[in-house]
């Protein structure tokens, strides 16, 4: 553990700040790179220490639970083949998620794994019969499907329900999973346990918002309102990168006397990985003080943090520390390392890791095909993309299809990407919007506007629900085609949809275009709509907004006060940018007038 703190202290990108900091009330969003502080959280350099975050005094005298919430939606080799997955391909996006499931280099892939609940059900290579019954009948509520299931005299034991729940969660079918928990609550099939309440809390937070989740906690019997319930709420605040509320829950867990766990610290690492990397070392020191050992997920978060900062040396030091502590790299960790080597241009190192992942027989390690396709596509290795896809082609799995379409797009083989898409259409009577979305992204990347428009029409005609990922691709398509009015109209439709929340990138495509034009009015409009949609003001969002004023040569009245109100403090770069739009700046002419 001490070695980990030293590795982080040696890194400029992850400076260890003053550790006399405190347990505070937190508040910040996703994935910025060079962030100055955006919240009333820890400020390392000069601002006064704010209320309590990391007093480094979490009482560890309480008994500890052995629940491992780091599991849950693990991506394993048990993804179902498409022939058994028609219902999955047909599933519309039932939740708004800020993660882009089709993105091959999603830095937060491990975050999703860490935030899911463990249901203590062994994974099966085939969907449960109850799961099939729930999703196979379109237009039928989950309650009706389960009523019919009971009428037919089929199994209604806890294991059957939990297996179906795991399948629903694994496929991110959170709306149906929530309906299932509501039906169980009404029909009292078995006695509720804390994990059942935690599962429902998680689904309510995902589908209806964290504020509804917090309201639900008040209805949970006090005897079941334990650590698992609160850390589930914490994970959902972290998933939305809401620093203020995440830190508030973290502090409340301390106040309630819950023992600090590695899972809880991992959640804070995920949060700070996205919003303020300088705080990561403080979390590690807290782990050290409480004698908690980092687990595999801790190391994966740190590997991803270093890799996404392009600190490959630091990433390799984390891996060496991990090995010295006796923690073995799993295949998912290796995939993460390979991706970061690839994005850093270290082709040979990336390919070496990929070969290690593949082992002696790719057929036996079939579950790695998705990652192999993804990274080989990024490396422009057409021969390897084709070799891996050939193994999957006859009976492809869902994630392999998404990865293959994107990989062929990366190597500029659009016809091959289209062929994979057509194969899926033939194999399934209905296709998930995600499959359309990844092909649409290929069209966007290749500026194939007419093909993209045709695909959107085809998707609409098929009756597919359009999710956040698809709206994002459509908006980008119109922006790059110069049809900004249509892009903004699409954003409005996405906002008005009650089923999804547009991705932040959907707003940013339009903001960047208006900034390029020096259009302050419309840049401000999109900035405000982004806040109204529930996204907190972020450092780089203000950076973009201020650039609109600079490009328009217009004064940015009150900008400093607005930033201060959002707890955003400029770094040197932003301060210089702000000075250019300062309405009261001195010029040679103003000096003469003075």
From Swiss-Prot:
Keywords: Mitochondrion, Repeat, Transit peptide. It is found in: Mitochondrion. Residues 62-75 have a biased composition (Low complexity). GO terms for biological process: mitochondrial mRNA modification. The keyword Magnesium does not apply. Its main location: mitochondrion. The keyword Transit peptide applies. Residues 1-67 form a transit peptide. It holds the Pfam family PPR. Residues 62-109 are annotated as: Disordered. PPR repeats lie at residues 226-260, 261-294, 295-329, 330-364, 432-466, 467-502, 503-537. Belongs to the PPR family. P subfamily. This is Pentatricopeptide repeat-containing protein At1g15480, mitochondrial. It comes from Arabidopsis thaliana (Mouse-ear cress).
């Amino acid at each position: 553990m001490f070695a980990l703190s030293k590795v982080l202290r040696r890194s400029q990108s992850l400076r260890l700040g003053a550790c006399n900091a405190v347990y505070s009330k937190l508040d910040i969003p996703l994935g910025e790179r060079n962030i100055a502080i955006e919240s009333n959280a820890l400020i390392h350099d000069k601002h006064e220490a704010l209320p309590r975050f990391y007093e480094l005094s979490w009482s560890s005298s309480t008994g500890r639970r052995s629940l491992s919430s780091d599991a849950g939606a693990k991506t394993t080799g048990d993804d179902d083949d498409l022939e058994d997955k028609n219902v999955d391909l047909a599933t519309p996006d039932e939740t708004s998620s800020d993660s882009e499931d089709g993105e091959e280099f999603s830095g937060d892939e491990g975050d999703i794994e860490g935030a899911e609940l463990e249901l203590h059900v062994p994974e099966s290579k085939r969907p449960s019969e109850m799961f099939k019954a729930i999703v196979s009948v379109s237009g039928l509520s989950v309650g009706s499907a389960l009523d019919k299931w009971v009428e037919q005299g089929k199994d209604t034991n806890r294991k059957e329900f939990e297996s179906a729940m795991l399948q629903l969660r694994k496929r991110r079918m959170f709306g149906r999973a929530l309906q299932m928990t509501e039906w169980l609550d009404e029909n009292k099939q078995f006695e509720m346990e804390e994990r059942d309440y935690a599962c429902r809390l998680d689904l309510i937070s995902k589908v209806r918002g964290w504020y509804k989740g917090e309201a639900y906690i008040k209805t949970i019997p006090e005897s079941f309102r334990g650590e698992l319930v609160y850390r589930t709420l914490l994970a959902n605040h972290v998933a939305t990168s809401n620093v203020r509320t995440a830190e508030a829950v973290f502090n409340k867990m301390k106040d309630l006397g819950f023992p600090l766990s590695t899972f809880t610290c991992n959640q804070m690492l995920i949060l700070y990985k996205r919003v303020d990397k300088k705080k990561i070392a403080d979390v590690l020191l807290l782990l050290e003080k409480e004698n908690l050992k980092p687990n595999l997920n801790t190391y994966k978060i740190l590997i991803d943090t270093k890799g996404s900062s392009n600190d490959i040396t630091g990433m390799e030091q984390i891996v060496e520390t991990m090995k010295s502590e006796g923690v073995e790299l799993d295949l998912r960790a290796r995939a993460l390392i390979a991706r970061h080597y690839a994005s850093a241009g270290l082709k040979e190192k990336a390919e070496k890791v990929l070969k290690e992942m593949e082992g002696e027989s790719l057929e036996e390690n079939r579950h790695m095909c998705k990652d192999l396709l993804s990274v080989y596509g990024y490396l422009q290795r057409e021969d390897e993309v084709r070799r891996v896809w050939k193994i999957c082609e006859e009976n492809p799995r869902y994630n392999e299809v998404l990865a293959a379409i994107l990989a062929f797009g990366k190597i500029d083989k659009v016809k091959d990407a289209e062929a994979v898409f057509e194969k899926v259409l033939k194999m399934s009577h209905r296709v998930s919007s995600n499959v359309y979305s990844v092909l649409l992204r290929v069209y966007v990347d290749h500026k194939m506007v007419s093909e993209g428009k045709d695909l959107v029409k085809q998707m609409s005609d098929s009756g597919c629900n359009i999710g956040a990922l698809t709206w994002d691709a459509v908006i980008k398509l119109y922006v790059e085609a110069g049809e900004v009015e249509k892009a903004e109209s699409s954003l409005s439709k996405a906002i008005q949809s009650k089923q999804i929340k547009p991705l932040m990138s959907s707003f940013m495509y339009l903001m960047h275009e208006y900034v390029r034009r020096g259009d302050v009015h419309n840049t401000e409009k999109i900035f405000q709509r982004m806040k109204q949609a529930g996204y907190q003001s972020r450092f780089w969002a203000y950076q973009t907004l201020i650039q609109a004023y600079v490009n328009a040569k217009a004064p940015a009245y009150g900008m400093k006060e607005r930033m201060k109100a959002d707890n955003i403090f400029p770094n040197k770069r932003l301060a210089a940018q702000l000075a250019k739009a300062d309405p009261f700046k001195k010029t040679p002419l103003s000096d003469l007038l003075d």
